């Protein structure tokens, strides 16, 4: 263990990186203790202490593929969940209902998209989201909630009963009665525990609307929670979503924002998409983005769809999926 000190945690880290002659992304950093100002800035004053250890290139690559260093193991071990056949069947059932409703409203779904869904080439809900039809799926889920509140026991179909039984067979805890305020409080406490384990001081708040829960994190160390290219934040959101999924049979949607990161990131992506489209038109060839989360890819697709002469599509597998922008 190599311990470095400084008047602040950041100063101690910089001293250690300089002495070890390694970049931050190749260092495993552990905060031993934070600085103490002492009484009147004189008595009991203590410097910050950090333990810095160089890590191998293999470890760096693995961490970069999942999430950045310094995060609890349960985040680093997290990847996009692989669904079982039963889970895919439940997911597909919701999407088929959504497609029927889309076509009833006079909106078309291309045969190519339908083929991708039926062949399981990509997650069905992801396809709908990227083609701009995820709202229909959300509306169907809200309608289910309204039926429950209006006395769903008499309206529940055999298909609904089979779905509930299938979820129970998967080992998922089925909650039929829930309080959205309580659910929001539970998931907020869960995320708070993870952030505490990261030794980051932060304040959490939440707001909600029916089945959508928004968590707001305010902190003086946003970079540690957001991570490189937002990877830590993405992992936190996946953990929170998985936490809700494992506790409730019906879907809740949770989004997490750190300070104003989500808004700022959206603005950056909009500008980036416009510049990328201009470059494609000027050079007459396709260009691809860095790996992005599903929500970020959706922003790129939306901006490109509003521009003439260019089109976009997603390629690759999670978590390294990216957007390709090409000429029409």
Swiss-Prot record:
PROSITE patterns: R3H. SMART domains: Jag_N (SM01245), R3H (SM00393). Keywords: Cell shape, Cell wall biogenesis/degradation, Chaperone, Cytoplasm, Phosphoprotein, RNA-binding. Residues 263-328 form the R3H domain. Residues 181-258 form the KH domain. Has an N-terminal Jag-N, a linker with a phosphorylated Thr, and 2 RNA-binding domains (KH and R3H). A phosphomimetic mutation and mutations that prevent nucleic acid binding are not tolerated in strain R6. The KH domain of this protein interacts with KhpA. The Jag-N domain is responsible for targeting to the midcell. Interacts with StkP which phosphorylates it. Interacts with KhpA via the KH domain of this protein. Interacts with MreC in the elongasome. Interacts with MltG, RodZ and YidC2, interacts with MltG's N-terminus. Strain Rx1 is unencapsulated. This is RNA-binding protein KhpB. It comes from Streptococcus pneumoniae (strain ATCC BAA-255 / R6).
